[in-house]
Amino acid sequence: MSTQHDEHDAAGATGVADQVVAAAERARAASHGLALATRAEKDAALQAMAEALLTREPEVLAANGEDVARAEANGTPPNIVDRLRLTQERVAAMAQGLRDVAALPDPVGEVLRGSTLANGLEMRQVRVPFGVVGMIYEARPNVTADAAGICLKSGNAVLLRGSSSARSSNAAIVAALRDAIAGTGLDPDVVQQVPGDSHDSVKALMRARGHVDVLIPRGGAGLIRSVVEESTVPVIETGVGNCHVYVDRAADLDKALAIVLNAKTHRTSVCNAAESLLVHADLADTFVPRVVAALQEAGVTVHGDERFQAEDGVLPATDEDYGQEYLSLDISAAVVPDLDGAIAHIRRWSSQHTEAIVTEDLAAARRFTAAVDSAAVLVNASTRFTDGGEFGFGAEIGISTQKLHARGPMGLTEMTSTKYVVTGDGHVR
């Protein structure tokens, strides 16, 4: 029996893999036409996609209701259900996001540099699409529309593999987007949902080297680690956000309190929320009681070192806490001896996403920004500002915490590569 079952599973996995490859081949064929599309053609498609989301909002929300009900019945944590849930406002924001992408400059064809060489050859380096992008992401249906829009504008076809917990929402969104794209004359296969809900489809996408040009995972640490370790397709690693706020001895404490509260509580389920608080030892008696009281009043559970534990209600912090991306109303906290102590703590525990310093000392700020090796380092500002929209990119497909190709919020230009176009007049070597 087990042999028959194993053979059935293997056959099923092979079938899913074949379906994923077939989808990738359709995406490749569609990408050739998209790479040649004008900005006007792409922008028309984006506007149509936005309108389709609004027109078909009732069916999108109905599909999302199925996903939310299933998640709640399965005991999914509230912060994950919040990511999964769509509302009229969130659908409207998705549509507006597509319109915002349409308003952005087209990166394709941009000349980065050019010159006439000594031998008379004219050389230009220009932006070009990757080709076919694979997206693997967790329970955020808005990513479906965001990724489709950014990939289309940057000339890339996209294969979308969202969480099975959002399968109904994603299917409704993709159907609306594909119909809109087809209505403008572009090939709808530039946006596809990866066939299948099982892990076999994820594995097939990760093994589709030669069919998929780049894979971008968005989600928790487990998902990202799995994709990075198992994929044969090149991966752009988007970040787990164990983000720190360090309150320096020269901080304005009113600013510091506002920044800590915003960074932790504004929206807990996102990767740029603060997860760890560091306070200079000189402020232990003045700022620690104040910030603990404010955090607790906001519903935050503080996991602290010995000094923080002197305050009522603070739980002991472990190594696991200091390395944790909570994505909830929890924060780890420690008193550090000085600026170098803060830097050392961040170097040990950071996921290299975003760190912030609060200080009025320019020298301390400069040392912190130079010494801390993260994708974004902020001075006197909340970690919540690490975002493509806030940075003026108009949109982002994720926040990269790796160093190759792209780092930080990934906008349209980060979704392109380059090629060299060289023009001669019968030149031979």
Swiss-Prot record:
<dbReference type="GO" id="GO:0050661">
    <property type="term" value="F:NADP binding"/>
</dbReference>
<keyword id="KW-0641">Proline biosynthesis</keyword>
<dbReference type="GO" id="GO:0005737">
    <property type="term" value="C:cytoplasm"/>
</dbReference>
<comment type="similarity">
    <text>Belongs to the gamma-glutamyl phosphate reductase family.</text>
</comment>
<comment type="pathway">
    <text>Amino-acid biosynthesis; L-proline biosynthesis; L-glutamate 5-semialdehyde from L-glutamate: step 2/2.</text>
</comment>
<dbReference type="InterPro" id="IPR016163">
    <property type="entry name" value="Ald_DH_C"/>
</dbReference>
<keyword id="KW-0963">Cytoplasm</keyword>
<protein>
    <recommendedName>
        <fullName>Gamma-glutamyl phosphate reductase</fullName>
        <ecNumber>1.2.1.41</ecNumber>
    </recommendedName>
</protein>
<dbReference type="InterPro" id="IPR015590">
    <property type="entry name" value="Aldehyde_DH_dom"/>
</dbReference>
<keyword id="KW-0521">NADP</keyword>
<dbReference type="InterPro" id="IPR000965">
    <property type="entry name" value="GPR_dom"/>
</dbReference>
<keyword id="KW-0560">Oxidoreductase</keyword>
<dbReference type="InterPro" id="IPR016161">
    <property type="entry name" value="Ald_DH/histidinol_DH"/>
</dbReference>
<comment type="function">
    <text>Catalyzes the NADPH-dependent reduction of L-glutamate 5-phosphate into L-glutamate 5-semialdehyde and phosphate. The product spontaneously undergoes cyclization to form 1-pyrroline-5-carboxylate.</text>
</comment>
<dbReference type="InterPro" id="IPR012134">
    <property type="entry name" value="Glu-5-SA_DH"/>
</dbReference>
<dbReference type="InterPro" id="IPR016162">
    <property type="entry name" value="Ald_DH_N"/>
</dbReference>
<dbReference type="InterPro" id="IPR020593">
    <property type="entry name" value="G-glutamylP_reductase_CS"/>
</dbReference>
<keyword id="KW-0028">Amino-acid biosynthesis</keyword>
<dbReference type="GO" id="GO:0004350">
    <property type="term" value="F:glutamate-5-semialdehyde dehydrogenase activity"/>
</dbReference>
<dbReference type="Pfam" id="PF00171">
    <property type="entry name" value="Aldedh"/>
</dbReference>
<dbReference type="GO" id="GO:0055129">
    <property type="term" value="P:L-proline biosynthetic process"/>
</dbReference>
